[in-house]
């Protein structure tokens, strides 16, 4: 991405303290009298260089005083950021998304999926090449983690993968596009009414996706039944409509969509309300048809308090249309409701080692013993580097 001089960090950092007397002009040749106007102009210049970011970057920096903006520029003028290298800015962006989600005590926080759940989905799906769709993409966590996974294998995620997303809330879609940009990823994200997955297949991807990953909103009601039916992607039929000709709970619409988007060897992984595993009526009928396909692969029960805005438990579902023949009549169930690490009073997560342990169960189920053996070797290496208890105690006493 080419950045004009006026959009470069060094230029902004070295501006005079009093912008009003600097005689600066924006890209449209208007006078700029505040640092906020200068930063807004920088955002506009960046958008001109990137079709993906057009209309996405914030343009309200004039809401902040010059003193606050100057201090922020100074804080990020830190040689430590350059020395660390790698995807530092991307990780900083993720950190603030995380903090933002924690401070939203409502369903508005559904734009953010906890990282340990995203990692679990990506680790089991193991994306390599092809089309990845998230039809409820929020801030894009599935794309970021998938990109990291592919890059870690020595490939270039932008060359190997094509990322597509739908997100009804335009603000969340902007978060997603910025998140992808700072992580060096490109993708096609649709937002607004045309991206309402209940009524639109915005990218025309039914039957074409190698991978589908999502954390859809749970238990959505008042979905217009006729409009949803006309939008298709319902290989197992429609959930029952109520007297108002609405779908009272859309969980099985989502589940049907995730299956319908897959190609003949595609894999899907998604978060779902725990209640969907045993809901009755038309949901049960759809679930029975789904199981009979032989493509349900893994189900993981997750405990309470994994979300910032919800305390209820959830489940992770996985489909695999390319399952080995000997696994076609099998589904792996993992009860991980009591397996977690407490972060604080209201939040739990899976640590890296807990993720590896859960992943190991899936490998053994699939007969991938080489991956399991490699993990054992990793365990042995880490344990071999551990400091003996007596030595650790001595070090602790010396520090005290």
PLM regions and their residue ranges:
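A conserved structural/catalytic subdomain of Rossmann-like adenosyl-cofactor enzymes
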Residues: 206-400
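Short, functional N-terminal and low-complexity linear motifs
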Residues: 36-42, 57-63, 84-90, 141-148, ...
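Conserved S-adenosyl-L-methionine
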Residues: 107-214, 219-230, 237-241, 252-253, ...
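Non-catalytic, mostly N-terminal accessory regions of nucleic-acid modification and defense proteins
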Residues: 1-128, 188-203, 301-304, 327-336, ...
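Short amphipathic alpha-helical segments, especially helix-boundary/capping motifs
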Residues: 46-50, 66-71, 93-98, 150-155, ...
């Amino acid at each position: 991405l080419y950045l004009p001089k006026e959009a470069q960090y060094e230029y902004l950092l070295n501006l005079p303290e009093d912008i009003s007397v600097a005689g600066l002009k924006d890209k449209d040749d208007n006078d700029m009298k505040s640092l906020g106007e200068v930063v807004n102009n920088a955002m506009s210049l960046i958008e001109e260089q990137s079709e993906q970011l057009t209309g996405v970057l914030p343009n309200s920096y004039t809401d902040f005083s010059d003193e606050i903006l100057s201090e922020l520029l100074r804080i990020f003028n830190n040689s430590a950021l350059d020395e660390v290298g790698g995807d530092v800015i991307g990780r900083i962006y993720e950190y603030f998304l995380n903090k933002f989600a924690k401070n939203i005590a409502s369903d508005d926080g559904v734009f953010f999926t906890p990282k340990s759940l995203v990692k679990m989905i990506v680790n089991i799906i193991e994306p390599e090449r092809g089309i990845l769709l998230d039809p409820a993409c929020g801030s894009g966590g599935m794309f970021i983690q998938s990109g990291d996974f592919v890059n870690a294998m020595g490939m270039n995620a932008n060359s190997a993968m094509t990322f597509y997303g739908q997100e009804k809330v335009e603000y969340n879609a902007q978060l997603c596009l910025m998140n992808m940009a700072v992580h060096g990823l490109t993708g096609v994200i649709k937002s607004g009414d045309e991206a309402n997955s209940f009524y639109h297949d915005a990218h025309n991807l039914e039957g074409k996706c190698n991978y589908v990953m999502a954390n859809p909103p749970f238990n959505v009601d008042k979905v217009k039944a006729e409009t949803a039916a006309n939008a298709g992607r319902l290989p197992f039929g429609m959930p029952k409509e109520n007297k108002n000709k609405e779908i009272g709970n859309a969980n099985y619409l989502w589940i049907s969509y995730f299956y319908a988007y897959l190609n003949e060897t595609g894999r899907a992984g998604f978060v779902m309300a725990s209640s969907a595993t045993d809901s009755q009526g038309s949901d049960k009928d759809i679930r029975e048809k789904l199981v009979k396909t032989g493509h349900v692969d893994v189900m993981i029960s997750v405990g309470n308090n994994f979300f910032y805005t919800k305390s209820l438990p959830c489940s992770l579902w996985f489909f695999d249309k390319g399952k080995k023949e000997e696994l076609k009549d099998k589904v792996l169930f993992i009860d991980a409701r009591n397996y977690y690490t407490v972060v604080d009073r209201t939040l739990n997560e899976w640590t890296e080692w807990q993720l590896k342990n859960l992943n190991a169960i899936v490998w053994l189920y699939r007969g991938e013993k080489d991956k399991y053996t490699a993990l054992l070797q990793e365990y042995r290496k880490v344990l071999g580097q551990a400091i003996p208890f007596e030595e650790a105690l001595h070090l602790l006493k010396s520090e005290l």
